[in-house]
């Protein structure tokens, strides 16, 4: 997950991304935070000029054949259909090869409210929902962050929970190869249920 702005645009980071993409062709996908496809709404969340900087980073990724996905937000009052059409036009304008209709490539997150009650995830849920635990992102993905002032990077289980200590899995990808307990409200709301109900 990246905003594709200054940290990603450092020459050393760009060189590292290019090496990774060359070593593992077709296996690297960067999810870019684009709160909204309209400059005024994105910049209202991220600061003046933010979308322009993100687009510059995305163009670099495009030109270096690094696959992209987008994490957007659905808190601006538009329908899912209208949001996806807007992102589609944004992608077309910049020649970004991202499918706006694929919820895995254009993820639209609702507002995250930890106070909203959600059902507990049980083993029965997987059968009721006809889903597999392997389908949730934390079963196969990790996020590496370097916190300000920290001596080493941290490997997190989930992009939605960057500040929850129980989802910090260590300081290396090897340390982070472990099962993740789905015990946060966001696990149920966003990843497992995704709007479905755990009652048969």
What are these regions (language model features)?
Residues 94-114:
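Acidic, glycine-rich loop-and-strand cores that form catalytic or ligand-binding grooves
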Residues 62:
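Anion (oxyanion) recognition and catalysis
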Residues 110-200:
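Accessory C-terminal segments flanking Radical SAM cores
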Residues 17-25, 94-98:
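Alpha-helix termini
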Residues 14-21, 55-58, 84, 88:
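Generic structural signal for well-ordered alpha-helices
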Residues 80-99:
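Short, electropositive alpha-helical surface patch
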Residues 1-12, 21-56, 67-72:
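Core AdoMet radical
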Residues 7-9, 76-83, 135:
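Active-site glycine- and acidic-residue-rich loops that bind
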């Amino acid at each position: 997950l990246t905003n594709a702005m200054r940290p990603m645009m450092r020459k050393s980071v760009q060189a590292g991304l290019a090496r990774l993409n060359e070593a593992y062709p077709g296996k690297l996908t960067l999810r870019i935070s684009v709160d909204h496809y309209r400059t005024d709404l994105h910049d209202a969340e991220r600061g003046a000029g933010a979308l322009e900087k993100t687009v510059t980073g995305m163009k670099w990724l495009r030109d270096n054949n690094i696959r992209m996905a987008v994490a957007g937000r659905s808190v601006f009052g538009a329908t899912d259909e209208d949001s996806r059409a807007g992102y589609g036009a944004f992608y077309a304008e910049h020649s970004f090869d991202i499918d706006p209709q694929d919820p895995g490539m254009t993820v639209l997150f609702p507002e995250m409210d930890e106070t909203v009650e959600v059902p507990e995830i049980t083993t029965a849920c997987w059968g009721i929902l006809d889903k597999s635990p392997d389908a949730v992102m934390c079963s196969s993905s990790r996020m590496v962050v370097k916190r300000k002032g920290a001596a080493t990077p941290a490997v997190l289980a989930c992009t939605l929970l960057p500040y929850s200590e129980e989802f910090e899995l260590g300081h290396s990808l090897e340390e982070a190869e472990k099962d993740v307990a789905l015990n946060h409200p966001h696990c149920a709301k966003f990843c497992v249920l995704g709007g479905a109900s755990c009652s048969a």
